[in-house]
Amino acid sequence: MRSTTRSIAACWLAGVSLAGAAGPEDARAPLPPASVACLRCHPSAAGVLSGPMATRAAEKGFARRAFGAEGDRFFAQSCTGCHVAGCDDCHGARPHAGRRPGNDACTRCHRGYFVGWDYLGRAPREDHARYQRGAVADGEPFLKMLPDLHAERGMTCADCHTMRSLQEGRRAAKTCAECHPAVSRDVPEHAFAAHLEKMTCEACHAAWAPQEYGTFLVNAESAEQQEAFSPLRAWGPWRKSAYLRQQDAPPLGLDEKGQVAPIRPQFVLFATDPSRRWENRLLVAEWKAFSPHTIRRGTVTCSECHDSPRRFLLEPEAERLYELEKDGLPLRSFWSRDQQTVTNGSFLPEDRHEAMNRKTPEYVRQHLRQWQRLLDRAAPRSGR
């Protein structure tokens, strides 16, 4: 795939969704001759070549929501590559060699803030040049994190994201339950029907996820400004940085099916541009329900959800650590729902949050069972 530092960074900002149809104005460029030849024998592949990875409809939509009438110009200046242009992008120049694309074909684009890198235990580093060090993959330094259990067992991206599922516009070929049908109710967390029926598996089993709170774009005009911001990543005329990055269990909300699922900023975008008289202007404050590829057998304890209003963007003001308004930002808190929205779902209704925090006798019993299981595992074992 075509990729430059500028285009990779901008794609990372503009979207990670595999959902969304392209409108007439988002028609892709003509296919390369080699891909036209492929389609003669593989006509179903047209679903990929006309899908979101090729049309970039989600990225264009984000740019238009953030920049309004100037959205298309932002997209044209800053997001010019790292999308499927033809069959060779994933299958290489020898598609009949009998080898399906490996993880490296996916992570050329699904890296950084994209879901994909996290599967292999990689998280994006801070944007400043001083942090661009350490291990490198796909030409970019990364933080070493805990990989997904499935990756440790040798599974590749293509084991779940098959060619047919991509052709049909589906995110995956199988659900978790199709591979793991026998869920033990003896596990305390599984004893509650609501946990199995109203939550995605990732809500509990995703160990961590990259999160960026406050994405900043600066349009440096003068030579002095350009020098000052030169250590930051360049996106066309912009330089990019972040207020805060975290790699822990992500917040929770509701996905498009109404299930409790991980959510994260995508993005809370501020822009400074002297030519427009913008200073930390809030362009958009969007969150997205997503599927962290960081699955582990264990989960957080009960109190990490049931006694954590911040995780549901209901942070009490008395517990607030970051005073954004004192920093000159037009937003009360990243963990307050004011001025923010979930583009493919919603925040958990406050009455449901209140109900889930009632300490019923069954909740107390299962909470004690959970702690007892943890203590039993930690206890010394004889004969080992």
Model feature map: region roles:
Residues R108:
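Acidic, glycine-rich low-complexity segments
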